[in-house]
């Protein structure tokens, strides 16, 4: 580890070697975790470089039309995420900044909209202005270590420390990254990609491409992004099927009451436990159910019980689903943009929590039915609906009703495939937690079939939820 620290000191001995643009400090006055409370009260991150990385070749200069599924998210801003990489002495030049910039410049040739800016067309409709100005690239250093974040849980402090502050430059920037060299020799890579430009699938595609160029060998084997978003244009005239409303646009009234204390905790469900849940979801008919449906059904039931919801209340689980394979014809491979609509499953609390349906068949069936409903007509109806209504996607203040649960699945996505040549990340997570009632499902990164369940909920029910989550195993 001494070698790592010497490398870090050598790398920053000369400010001129970094082509320094600006230096600033972010003082952290909050405690990041109880484990390190005595050490981390006044830690800081020092930004030593901030610049724009432009595509290394000429790219199209044009206004890129945004689909209704993109416009839904125009006010959501940037999605903050952090990757942690432990120090590795081989193959040398750990997280070499020049190498990362060169790889970014290559990736932005294919993903040229990410080098543009959010703008408006002549009619006042949001679009991506493909200017080629580049992505924001920040380099920083910190006396913190990866061990200070071993719980790998999202927090406002995590975002402040490691995710680039796009608002300090221009909110119209679509792509920003920050490479923070830590005292232990490791690196925290923070990303801020604007949701109007990419959903999770497209974001991981971009990061995979960037990291592949950094590893070397050229990009011949990489899948190119597909940029024609007019494939998701509304029909003329728009037509919304009556049965589609309950599937993709359920009304939600947020409470204006002060929010309770919200905590975020990670739970690991082993491969054997996932298998047991999937068996419980199909009963004796020998059918099959996805890991997403099985885990979502179990978590939904546990939350309803932990919250002690009235038996007659209607509870609802909503989740984002990709439209890419549901359309006819399917969207081309590598479609870059937002290809997500939200679906919902609902039921009476007594049915979701009934002890007589311990096999979870009913609950999983409700979720599976919602998934099966998504066909070309449902997707087209959703696109037409969002074109007609022009919904403001800015997150509303307030808290969700206790009867609501939202599950976002990153299962099967290449979350840990962002390898720049120095190994895969030790952990990846969103840098901020959601309001109570949000759950993220993702592979645990151990390559053992286990799943990480990241739960944001009211502090008062956390212990009950944990007990219920594991009680059936």
For each predicted feature, which ranges?
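Soluble acyl-CoA-dependent acyltransferase catalytic core bearing the H(X)4D motif
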Residues: 29, 41, 47-62, 75-78, ...
